[in-house]
């Protein structure tokens, strides 16, 4: 009877406890308690101020309860906080007492289907679960409620935990340095994937049901950190964010942003999921440890998701069944009527006295069509995640078709136009070019000393006074005045002029003044010669010689005599050469018969020229015998010597005394 009375009292409180407080969208646990924020990250309330070391956090969106663990509490390890009415923000229920085997709870996650709370303990290296609706009894009555889900090795540090309720999977992180990993397991604890490659001290982890991915944070080597992402099978890994000098501990996504905690500077960061460079700090204060972004994701937005439809339907059936039971108990003790009525086939959740709407409706009473005035220039449809989506007209884009596709497309005052196929094109202003008019034709540094203007889509330069060149890069006075003339700028005409020296005149000091005495009829020369003193007529200079100088006539005669002498000697040598006796040239032919030994190539007869033997031994060849050449002999004698030598038995050498001696 006592337990029934408690249940009835609790049911009555649920019915009459209609939510009057401001709705919160985010909650952050800090050293000074639990802080509640609206969608603009303005703090609207706080609670649990007696807790200063909250280590883990989970949320029940059906009953709107927060579950958390505090490291320093001596008696209990899990607590709950009711977030429905404002006056309940400070009402904390003690759910699970500590025991001798209790370890340091590092992660909490809530399963709406089985209404179980899962957690990881660092000291016991274990994953546990418990049915939360059975908690709150005396300590000795909770021993049999706790279920051991998984036991990991001692060299594993369980750091965080999350649940994919739609596909019924658990994910936890192992932050031990040598064995760091991301683990995917079944709800009964059976490990399905243990991803270790390039994982270093992972910490907080969360499931993004909007994109079917998981996010986790890693404390990298030294000062670095990363926020990593992978699909639900822990594949297709991507580094979402990289940075330094921060200590990220927790991560939580919504449809557009990813929120993560930096314990180094006590900040909560908001980073756009589509562009990680777009980030801002939404909270800075007491040391944050965990956060939850409340979006009604499971019950409100996953009703049409094929992967979640069956699970969500079963959750709603459980809520309907429980609401009927609570309603019957409440009507038995009070005649107070229902405070709200759900429209458009909405379901009343008696636990929270609020409506669970169909996908097409929203609002407190499900009175607002979700597509009502949502699309500005397009048609609205309800997506698989129960969110409104727009099919925009050809000229518009954006989440709500509220932006013309030409807005901001053409830069630098370019005009945008649409083709028949909906393609954008730009007509650029005079000084710009490119597909979006993004390129300036005249840049600031094109003309060095002048003003740039566009002529036929080509940059041109109007030079400042005193400069010239295609890009005004040359000073006009450079090498302008010749013959050491001085270049100056005329202040009246703004043109350069030359101040010439005493010997020159002309526009550029190019005319010698002595030429001005010549009357050549050149008008250009005459205009520069006006006012120039006329010099005397040019005459042939008189040459005088000193008395002690040399006599050139003597020199010329000496040179002529020497040349004549050389010529005479040359003639005499030539004549002497012509009259010298020639060397004899004797040719004799030998006719070779069949009885003669062959000494040459086969032919009718073999011939040999005597002079061809001159390259033989000097004793065998008379033509190069130096003694014979020096001996005075008549031509007939010399010829006879050669003939005798050829016919000798020795063959081809002469019977000279020197050669005979050499033979002996």
Swiss-Prot record:
Residues 574-664 are cytoplasmic. One of its GO terms (molecular function) is Wnt receptor activity. Its main location: membrane. Keywords: Cell membrane, Differentiation, Disulfide bond, EGF-like domain, Glycoprotein, Membrane, Oogenesis, Repeat, Signal, Spermatogenesis, Transmembrane, Transmembrane helix. Residues 367-399, 402-438, 473-510 form the EGF-like domain. Residues 1-21 form the signal peptide. It comes from the Eukaryota. One of its GO terms (cellular component) is plasma membrane. The keyword Transmembrane applies. Gene3D superfamilies: Laminin (2.10.25.10), TolB, C-terminal domain (2.120.10.30). It is found in: Cell membrane. Residues 22-552 are extracellular. This is Protein cueball. It comes from Aedes aegypti. The lineage of its organism: Eukaryota, Metazoa, Ecdysozoa, Arthropoda, Hexapoda.
